[in-house]
Amino acid sequence: MKINTAEFIISNSIVSLCPQEHLPEYAFIGRSNVGKSSLINMLTNHKSLAKTSGRPGKTQLINHFKINNNWFLVDLPGYGYAKVSKKTKEVFQQFITDYFEKREQLVCAFVLIDIRHEAQKIDLEFITYLGEIELPFCIVFTKADKISKGKVAQHVAAYRTALLKNNWEEMPHHFVTSATEHTGKESLLSYIDEVNQDIFKQNGF
């Protein structure tokens, strides 16, 4: 799939105020500084569609971007950010869970994980949460250019082992990406396109 247009539509923290159009939505979420904004900019061929920042927790709202006029890319706040107040964190967590549990247009969540690190408890807990609410999701490993291919394979295998220990029957669908080298761009966009085509056929688009 080629992305021809990417347009910012709205930022908000209330699910009922999200766009009313019945277009498929793909949510991107991960721990702070996982490289989410860089990945989104790489996928959409924009240098600053999503704002990049070295400060954790910079994204603090639900951000909708309309792609090719027929689907939405949704940029969500990171989880596990340390430099916001406890009350603020609770509010973020509430509207994130509201979005995941109430948003009918959401068809898939992409959970971003920094491939450089070992399996993190907070990532495993979030993946378990998505499984519990039966929301389709994929894992997107980021920053693959920062370590060797051998290390990448080792860390993916470690996540597989950790998930199997947490009662997953198999490793969820996953992608290995690098925003710097555009690694994984085509496979991720192809996946979104395949899901979109199925949805469009079902709805007679």
UniProtKB/Swiss-Prot annotation:
Q: Where is the EngB-type G domain?
A: 22-198
Which keywords, in A-to-Z order, does the entry hold?
Cell cycle, Cell division, GTP-binding, Magnesium, Metal-binding, Nucleotide-binding, Septation
Q: Does the keyword Cell cycle apply?
A: yes
Its required cofactor(s), as named, are:
Mg(2+)
Q: Name one GO biological process term.
A: division septum assembly
Bilayer-crossing regions: none
Q: Where does Mg(2+) bind?
A: S37, T59
Q: Which SUPFAM superfamilies match?
A: P-loop containing nucleoside triphosphate hydrolases
| Sequence positions that bind GTP | 30-37, 57-61, 75-78, 142-145, 177-179
Q: Which GO terms describe its molecular function?
A: GTP binding; metal ion binding
Superkingdom field: Bacteria
Among InterPro entries, the record links this protein to: G_ENGB_dom, GTP-bd, GTP-bd_ribosome_bio_YsxC, P-loop_NTPase
Q: NCBIfam families this protein is in?
A: GTPase_YsxC
Q: What does this protein do?
A: Necessary for normal cell division and for the maintenance of normal septation.
What family does the database annotate?
Answer: Belongs to the TRAFAC class TrmE-Era-EngA-EngB-Septin-like GTPase superfamily. EngB GTPase family.
Q: What is this protein called?
A: Probable GTP-binding protein EngB
